Amino acid sequence: MAGVSCTIETDKLPPNLRGICQRRESRAADSEDLNVTKRNIGVLGAGTWGMALARMLCVSGNDVQVWSAIEKEIDSLSSTRVHPNLPGMKIPDELRFTKSIEEACKDKDVLLFAVPSVFVRSTAAKARPYVADDQIIVDVAKGIEPDTLYTMTEILADELGKEGG
């Protein structure tokens, strides 16, 4: 995926993010020159955090596919290529969307869980049949499950039968 191009309309971003995004863009362009392993990544969750991470992973040259439990959200993101809470961030054409959690999980090197903490367990349960033993699992949600006092990593280990680190 060398040569992935995308733009951020930095004038539409909050002032504190403008410089960060410009630096990130220049680093992403430089990543083609590095000896970096490109990954096939499934992102579970299309909220603000999930989409920001998906975009960053995509412009870094990875093959990224995003899933959401909200089908209308996938339709909107696919057609507009803009997240409603991130109006200055254009979604690269190379970033793909799916309504199928199976498609988002299968044949991926990495699964990135980017759903709110209250949905980590239910999302992991939906993903469980499609998670391979050799997949890298990453969770970016924070919090503690009230009933069990488990962290999000412990919930994923419980649901997926994989120990995290």
Residue ranges and their predicted role:
Residues 11, 16, 30-33:
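Intrinsic-disorder-associated, low-complexity terminal segments enriched in Asp/Asn/His/Tyr and depleted
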Residues 19, 33-90, 96-99, 126:
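NAD(P)+-binding Rossmann beta1-loop-alpha1 motif at the extreme N-terminus of oxidoreductases
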Residues 101, 110-165:
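Rossmann-like NAD(P)(H) cofactor-binding subdomain of soluble oxidoreductases
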Residues 104-106:
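A short, aliphatic-rich alpha-helical micro-motif
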